[in-house]
């Protein structure tokens, strides 16, 4: 069953985020992940609160693969780069199992 990584971010440093994107793309591919959508074209339909600047949904083959990617030796060095590029008060990485 597929699993999804939902990413919410507000950008602090666009150049660092681009560097992260370039470096993380082949690591995601190695784990069979693909972006379903990404960008800033989201709207709040109900509820209250601030929206992040960007969102993404990444599909993985299953939850075990998603967790293996996150914990992998290839991805661990990229976490600090990602964190330096975004506002830590608005960033969230959320996992969701597919139905």
Identify the role of each PLM range:
Residues 76-83:
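Low-complexity, intrinsically disordered Gly/Pro/Thr-rich segments
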Residues 83-99:
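C-terminal end-helix/capping segment
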């Amino acid at each position: 069953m597929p699993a999804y990584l939902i990413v919410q971010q507000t950008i602090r440093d666009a150049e660092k985020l681009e560097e992260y994107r370039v470096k993380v793309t082949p690591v995601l591919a190695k784990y069979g992940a693909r972006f379903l959508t990404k960008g800033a074209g989201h709207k709040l339909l109900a509820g209250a609160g601030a929206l992040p600047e960007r969102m993404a949904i990444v599909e993985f083959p299953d939850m075990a693969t998603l967790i293996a990617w996150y914990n992998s030796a290839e991805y661990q060095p990229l976490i600090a780069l990602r964190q330096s590029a975004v506002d830590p008060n608005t960033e969230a990485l959320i996992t969701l199992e597919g139905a």
